[in-house]
């Protein structure tokens, strides 16, 4: 009987340690802040825009986000400048689970294949910004 009791205590201790470790891992994952890719895109009069290529970019860019569970939060909406100089083009904001996924998307083969379309017809400033965790 003593052996069974010791075995039961050992199993319970192992389960408790496993649960504590799982909770610690989950807490660490929950604290990873989201990330946002922010793009300021301006038509460049010195570059020749190819309408067919621009349509391809508009179709393929959203598809390239799917593998990274990302989504557009802002995609060229109306801008009201509250302070400072107004952007000359439009703004795009894309939400990601974390910075690693945002960078993974930007350097992914799917986005690398279409990135030159945007680069050849616009001036862009692309940033990745770490957000804050839910509080």
Segments the model singles out, each with a brief description of its role:
Residues 1-11:
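Bacterial N-terminal signal peptides that target proteins for export
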Residues 3-4, 73, 116, 123:
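Intrinsically disordered, low-complexity sequence elements enriched in Ser/Thr/Gly/Pro
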Residues 5, 18-90, 97-101, 131-135:
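Short S/T/G/P-rich N-terminal loop/turn motif that feeds into the first structured element of a domain
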Residues 10-20:
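Bacterial N-terminal signal peptides
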Residues 16, 54, 64, 108, ...:
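Generic serine detector
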Residues 91-135:
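Surface-exposed, polar helix/loop patches in the mature regions of secreted/periplasmic/lumenal proteins
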């Amino acid at each position: 009987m003593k052996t069974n009791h010791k075995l039961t205590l050992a199993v319970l201790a192992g389960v408790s340690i496993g649960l504590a470790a799982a909770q610690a891992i989950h807490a660490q994952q929950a604290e990873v802040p989201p990330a946002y890719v922010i793009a300021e895109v301006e038509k460049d009069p010195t570059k020749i825009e190819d309408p067919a290529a621009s349509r391809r970019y508009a179709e393929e860019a959203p598809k390239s986000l799917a593998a990274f569970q990302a989504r557009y939060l802002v995609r060229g909406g109306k801008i009201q400048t509250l302070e400072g100089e107004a952007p000359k083009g439009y703004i795009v904001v894309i939400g990601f689970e974390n910075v690693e996924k945002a960078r993974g998307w930007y350097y992914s083969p799917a986005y690398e294949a279409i990135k030159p379309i945007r680069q050849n017809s616009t001036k862009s400033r692309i940033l990745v910004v770490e957000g804050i965790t839910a509080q």
